[in-house]
Regions:
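Residue-level signal for inorganic ion chemistry
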Residues: 35, 71, 93, 116, ...
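ALDH superfamily catalytic-core signature
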Residues: 9, 234-378, 441, 488-490
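Rossmann-like NAD(P) dinucleotide-binding subdomain of oxidoreductase/dehydrogenase enzymes
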Residues: 128-270, 398
């Protein structure tokens, strides 16, 4: 029985002050798997952003005073909504983004729910401190919500990244203006329709449209107390500069070129799956994708040949079909970038082991590409240094532990990475030596709430998916109390 794919409204307005605005100038949102228009959404104006910020500022006056118990209850109710609508949200995310429904059903949507429940839990345990400095002086340290937060989320995980941003900000007592990517705005809009009645007016506001227009205007807006962004390092630098000019903090989760390291004594079958999960999950459109595969020389030929065969078996297909293992890239521009890098690799003398071509035939209307393995003799190749953001992994041979650590760290990025070995001492040595914010050991792309995620070097500033994010959305107030009744005697 064919699935009903008509799961979106025809048009979407903006969510400002708890009210859905009448759709204004409209943009099309496309299904990247077949090129069909899914729905139309509003291209917000500067006045729309002003209204959203004003609503968030007004709502902050009361939202900041709510108790942690009240906020935790709302976060849990939001998680309930996600759980109750798992199939709907999974299908919407799949249609909007192109990723297989088996991923959205098993990962994106459940992880989003878990994120809200996690912050509902940890906010209840937050405490201030009181220090008796001497017999007459007391120092009290409190954390207060930082204010109105401007959040910009990417197209690769629109639903989950919204949860990563919204949950800690709400938990901390902040109000939000959030801007999704113009490539994937629909799943967040649909989600907001379901949870809007749970939140006071103005606490959550959604601005959609072109990043070069409404997104850029947000960066110049003086009404924000903090910015938060997930996306490319290039745009992250731009946002960091904007935040610095306004003297406000920014959380930036940026790009990566992560090393997936396989030693001779790896758990072979599990490692084969881990190499695939590292680069084929979400069609390789993952900031921490294991796009550099380092394999020790003793097992190199066996592992790479087996991996190439596994890549050839991957079922690339319509993402809403249950047996599809890899869906379409998010848009034509991203597919073009991927194919460009395959050509660059060939021009550099790298060998295409498998893949590297756009898929035609029955999938020709969509943005589909073959899972691709490229063999490089050097870590200096552009395909080993530059973020491709697609299902393209560069395979490099290494001899020693010291050599692979040096190559893995030879990157401007430092977001993710993995070590595969049955020797736990080796795993810990290499993990400690890697210049990266997240190291998986004998696994890859596990992203639960409770484990801090963020990058070293140009991969970003700050951490997400952990209670430490509450510190990023709050500011410290110190109340200094003197109980002495006499004059101090200075004057």
């Amino acid at each position: 029985m064919a699935k009903d794919l008509n799961v979106f409204d025809k048009e979407y307005g903006l969510l400002i002050n708890g009210v859905w605005t009448k759709p204004g100038a409209l943009l099309d949102s496309y299904n990247p798997a077949n090129g069909e228009v899914l729905a139309k959404f509003t291209d917000a104006t500067d006045a729309d952003v002003d209204a959203a910020v004003a609503a968030a500022q007004e709502a902050f006056k009361t939202w900041r005073k709510t108790t942690t118990t009240e906020r935790a209850a709302i976060l849990n109710k939001i998680a309930d909504v996600i759980d109750d609508n798992l199939e709907l949200f999974a299908l919407q995310e799949t249609l909007d983004n192109g990723k297989p429904i088996r991923e959205t059903r098993a990962a994106d949507i459940p992880l989003a729910s878990d994120h809200f429940r996690y912050f509902a839990s940890v906010i209840r345990g937050e405490e201030g401190t009181a220090t008796q400095l001497d017999s007459e002086d007391l120092s009290i340290v409190l954390r207060e919500p930082i204010g109105v937060v401007g959040q910009i989320i990417p197209w690769n995980f629109p639903f989950l990244m919204a949860a990563w941003k919204i949950a800690p900000a709400l938990a901390a007592g902040c109000t939000i203006v959030i801007h999704p990517s113009s490539s994937t705005s629909l799943s967040l809009l649909s989600f907001a329709q379901k949870i809007n009645q749970l939140l006071p007016k103005g606490v959550l506001n959604i601005i959609t449209g072109r990043g070069s227009k409404s997104g850029e205007y947000m960066l110049r807006h003086k009404g924000f107390n903090k910015l938060a962004f997930t996306g490319s390092t290039e745009i992250g630098r731009h946002i960091g500069i904007a935040a610095a000019e306004m003297l406000i903090p920014a959380t930036l989760e940026l790009g990566g070129k992560s090393a997936n390291i396989f030693f001779d004594d790896m758990p072979f079958d599990k490692a084969l799956e881990g190499a695939q999960k590292g680069i084929l999950f979400n069609q390789g459109q993952v900031c921490c994708a294991g796009s550099r595969i380092f394999v020790q020389e003793g097992i190199y030929d066996k592992f790479v040949n087996a991996l190439a065969e596994e890549f050839k078996k991957i079922k690339v297909g319509l993402p809403w079909e249950d047996d599809t293992q890899m869906g379409s890239q998010v848009n034509a521009g991203q597919l073009e970038t991927i194919l460009k890098y395959v050509k660059i690799g060939e021009q550099e003398g790298c060998r295409i082991i498998t893949g590297g071509k756009k898929i035609e035939g029955a999938l020709g209307k969509g943005e589909f590409v073959e899972p691709t393995l490229i063999e490089a003799d050097s870590n200096n190749a552009r395909v080993a240094q530059e973020e491709i953001f697609g299902p393209v992994a560069t395979v490099i041979k290494f001899k020693t532990e010291e050599e692979v650590i040096k190559m893995a760290n030879d990157s401007e990025y430092g977001l993710g990475g993995a070590v595969w070995s049955k020797d736990i001492n080796r795993c810990l040595r290499v993990s400690n030596a890697l210049e990266t914010g997240r190291v998986w050991v004998n696994c890859y792309n596990r992203l639960p709430a409770g484990a801090p995620f963020g990058g070293y070097k140009t991969s970003g500033i700050g951490r997400e998916t952990h209670k430490m994010m509450l510190a990023a959305y709050t500011q410290v107030k110190n109340i200094y109390i003197s109980t002495r009744e006499e004059r101090e005697g200075f004057y």
